Amino acid sequence: MFINEYGGRDDPTIVLLAPMMVSGSDLYGMMKPHFKGRYHVVAPDQGAHGRAGAYVSPDEEYRALKQFLTETGCTRIALVYGASLGVAVGYRLFLDPAFEVERAWFDGVALARNARFAEWFMKRMFRSRKKTLAKTCAEASPSLVKMYGYDFAKMMTRNFERITIEDIDNICRACCHYDLRKLTDDEQRRLHLDFGEKDFDWKYSRKTVPVYMPKAELVIRPGYPHCAYMAAEPKAYVEQIEAFMGREASCC
């Protein structure tokens, strides 16, 4: 993990944890123009992305993030944001009693204890796409363009070029295994869950959300695939995040 830090530490702290094929600096660059408030933003490049080393495990990633936040005195977090891969670390931060996390926004996560088929399928898919990319040297993967548009797909393709097969295996494992427990009412009222209607991760989470976090705020984006709403509508997306941060919490 490589820590990217923006803004002054006297402002409310936001932690941005990006999905696979998006670095922390990429995610910050996408969101920054649309934030209306002033924030201290911590946007790490997770393993295999940006200026970070290899991706080993979410525990290894979280140790690095926790060390940075603790050493810099950033123990009160206004928002932890995680998308897809980023939720593996964000979930740990949200539930760590060492921190006071006011809000959490998680997008496109397979909330499952052991999604073995999803892990196998993802590994196979990304390995195949890696081989195809090596042969074609495409500037933007056609499959990603179809889901996210050309500019976003170009950025993702650039990041994918440096991800190794070992990184793929470790990332897919991280995305498919969560230590789930029933969240308290207080934890649920501070949590927002976001999914595209066509998101394959929603197929897993739709079974576990009613069991472990039924009172969390839940939004399903009609017609969108995995993490695609954030790419298509970044301005509206960030506005909704800030509205959630400022909303009076309620379990009702």
Locate predicted features.
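Conserved HGGG/HGGXW glycine-rich cap/lid loop of the alpha/beta-hydrolase fold
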Residues: 2-51
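Active-site loop/oxyanion-hole signature of alpha/beta-hydrolase fold enzymes
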Residues: 42-79
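Gly/Ala-rich beta-loop-alpha elbow adjacent to hydrolase catalytic centers
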Residues: 82-86, 90
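Flexible "cap/lid" loop of the alpha/beta hydrolase fold
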Residues: 91, 95-96, 101-132
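Conserved alpha/beta-hydrolase catalytic His-Asp/Glu region
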Residues: 115-117, 132-185
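Short beta-strand/loop motif that positions the catalytic acidic residue
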Residues: 187, 193-195
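Conserved alpha/beta-hydrolase "acid-adjacent" motif
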Residues: 200-206
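Catalytic histidine-centered segment of alpha/beta-hydrolase-like enzymes
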Residues: 224-238
